[in-house]
């Protein structure tokens, strides 16, 4: 499946992201909840989220527990109406030097664990930035969370060497996962 992401990348405002997501038809999209709501009235976005969820699988990108709180609130208020909530936890994106550490997963898990059953995600995924990418992914995998690895987030192997290609990162991760 092709997954389209609507992250702002420091370039696109929420109106541009909403316009893109409204016009395309793809099986799977990811939406950074904090970015899509920037300068938007959340209640006014209910029809947008309804249309998006009707035509695509939607993965909500969460950079911290505050994003998780916001998403949970939108679901609770029926602004986002879904029976199958999917989230992507992003570790290290807004940390010093975009470096992630496995303990950055803790606030996400703590918030998730206090949610009522109907607000818990059906599918969780993680990506992590910097040299800590693989240690973070290993921690997440041990919690039953799907992992996303690649050069977009980090180029370092667990031994500190720079990977020659994405396949080297994937192999390093797979080799370290329990059988």
Where do the protein language model's features map onto the residues?
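Active-site beta->alpha loop and helix N-cap motifs at the rims of alpha/beta catalytic domains
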Residues: 1-41
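Alpha/beta catalytic barrel-like cores
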Residues: 1-4, 151, 178-179
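Alpha-helix C-terminal capping segments
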Residues: 21-22, 49-53, 173, 177
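C-terminal helical cap(s) of enzyme catalytic domains, especially alpha/beta-barrels
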Residues: 157-179
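Flexible glycine/acidic-rich beta-alpha junction loops that bind and position SAM and/or redox cofactors
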Residues: 10-14, 90-97, 156-157
């Amino acid at each position: 499946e092709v997954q389209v992401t609507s992250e702002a990348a420091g370039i696109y405002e929420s109106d541009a992201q909403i316009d893109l997501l409204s016009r395309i038809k793809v099986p799977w999209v990811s939406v950074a909840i904090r970015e899509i709501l920037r300068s938007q009235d959340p209640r006014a976005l209910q029809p947008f989220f309804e249309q998006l969820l009707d035509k695509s699988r939607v993965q909500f990108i969460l950079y911290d527990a505050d994003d998780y709180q916001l998403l949970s609130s939108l679901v609770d208020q029926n602004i986002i109406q879904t029976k199958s909530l999917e989230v992507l936890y992003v570790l290290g994106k807004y940390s010093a030097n975009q470096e992630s550490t496995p303990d950055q997963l803790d606030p996400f898990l703590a918030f998730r664990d206090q949610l009522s059953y109907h607000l818990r995600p059906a599918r969780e995924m993680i990506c992590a930035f910097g040299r800590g990418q693989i240690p973070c992914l290993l921690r997440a995998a041990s919690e039953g969370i799907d992992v996303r690895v690649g050069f977009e987030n980090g180029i370092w192997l667990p031994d500190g060497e720079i990977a020659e290609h994405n396949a080297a990162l994937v192999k390093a991760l797979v080799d370290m996962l329990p059988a």
